[in-house]
Amino acid sequence: MSDTTLNVSLASQGYPEPAELFANLGTAPLVEHAVRNGEGLLCVDGPLVVETGKHTGRSAKDKFIVRDAETENTVWWGKTNVAMSPEHFAALKADFIKALGEKDRLYVADLFGGSQPEHRVKVRVINELAWHNLFIRTLLVRPTTDELASFVPEYTIIDLPSFRADPARHGSRSETVIAVNFTEKLILIGGTAYAGEMKKSVFGILNYLLPVKGVMPMHCSANVGPDGKTAVFFGLSGTGKTTLSADASRTLIGDDEHGWSDTAVFNFEGGCYAKMIRLSAEAEPEIFATTKRFGTVLENVVIDPVTRTIDLDDNSLAENSRGSYPIDFIPNASEENLGPVPANLIFLTADAYGVLPPIARLTPDQAMYHFLSGYTARVAGTEIGVTEPEATFSTCFGAPFMPRHPSVYGNLLKERIAKGGVKCWLVNTGWSGGKATQEGIKRMPIKATRALLNAALDGSLNSATFTKDPNFGFEVPVEVPGVDTKLLDPRGAWADGEEYDKTAQELVRKFVDNFQQFADHVDQSVRDAAPVAA
């Protein structure tokens, strides 16, 4: 049985077809299937609420790329991009096909990765779970009926949470596996129900393909101001990419993954994937409103099985609870999913050391340095006695998703900054006045962050007086209307200036040590943009 006809059948791809094949279903039927299959519950306000089991985040250590003639010299092999042999992949593929043949029911979605037609990739996703199919249909770009009629997939993703990998037979690390084969244009995901693996797999495809075409792929959010100028926000998880780009006064291009071509910044996706934990209507009204919409999928959000009400503050299932929803659920979302090339780049960091200023102006060389560094810091689990902040460097603000050498992306970025005269800013959404682990130290007020951002984006900050930071070398504004002056001086915000100096130098050394891996791949001017160790 099939609800809709595929232009290219599964059989023609060499995959078995189940008794029930549901292709390119819409939101309502997929929600019905998910509920009927026992995959989730409908919330009182409309969203579908699901649990992902033991995997509530990405399984970064279980991801592999097949090492062959195509990838041998094009992939940056190491801790992030781990090799799988073609032989192991062949065994894995054979077992995936066998597992597909044992399914009574499958869901297929033909979708685009990328909103700019000349730079998008055609992706087919095959799922055993209806809610997974709904998720990826929400997150990627949905073809029109006419486009589906002639759709020929370039890449295929098969996602089977029930599959269990065998490390001895498949070369995996555990029963969970995400295996990417750029030669066969096939991605196999097994042993995890975390839906984000699918979206990040498509991101990885585009991050591999687009630099060859001179297009800069970015792990970022992006929006456009009333003046028609685009801002791009880079940042690791938890730094505020989604929150700060969902601004009612600006048009949202997207919240997570974009390309920068000669003519546009374009969203890779057609949906958003936002953190839900402790979400509030006051702090994030646009995102909060999506938790009351039919079509939203809430992952690992606690729901009362009787009243069907949800508790966004309850982290008993996961700290990384998520919500996926179509981008048009956000007011002022761009209808085309794209905008002009950027006027401003924002590097977001949540500095748990409390030494970075709330905003700093960067030169193009400093921008490339901080892009390649990809710094943020988190507070490690204090429940096990760890009381110091933990520095995290994820190159390009998205190391797990960048198959090529970071310098490929860094040089592309530097070229585009120079070509467009783009203004670059570092924004600290983390802590001020001390380390995050110290009692009474609070995060930067979001109102202050927004005020500083607005001043940067509307151009008024350019006329401010700046002072050079002695540790990091970038320029920090002395005064900004509507922002407490004490906040702008990170050293002055500390009760003990000497303790600040010591902590700042501690962070400087971490930057310097981390950047050694890139030193031979960048110009001297970028090396000179490094923070200064005393």
From Swiss-Prot:
Predominant cellular place of this UniProt entry's protein = cytoplasm
What subcellular locations does the record give?
A: Cytoplasm
- Offer an example of a GO molecular function term for this protein: metal ion binding
**EC number(s) per UniProt?**
4.1.1.49
Keywords per UniProt: ATP-binding, Cytoplasm, Decarboxylase, Gluconeogenesis, Lyase, Manganese, Metal-binding, Nucleotide-binding
Q: Name one GO cellular component term.
A: cytosol
The residues that the entry says bind substrate are 58, 194, 200, 322
The cofactor note from the UniProt entry for this protein is:
Binds 1 Mn(2+) ion per subunit.
Which of this chain's residues are annotated to bind Mn(2+)? 200, 219, 256
Reactions catalysed: oxaloacetate + ATP = phosphoenolpyruvate + ADP + CO2
SUPFAM superfamilies xrefs: PEP carboxykinase N-terminal domain, PEP carboxykinase-like
Which parts of the sequence bind ATP? 200, 219, 235-243, 284, 322, 449
InterPro entries (alphabetical):
PEP_carboxykinase_ATP, PEP_carboxykinase_C, PEP_carboxykinase_N
Q: Name one Pfam family in it.
A: PEPCK_ATP
Q: Which family does the entry's similarity section mention?
A: Belongs to the phosphoenolpyruvate carboxykinase (ATP) family.
Q: What is this protein called?
A: Phosphoenolpyruvate carboxykinase (ATP)
Which gene underlies this protein? pckA
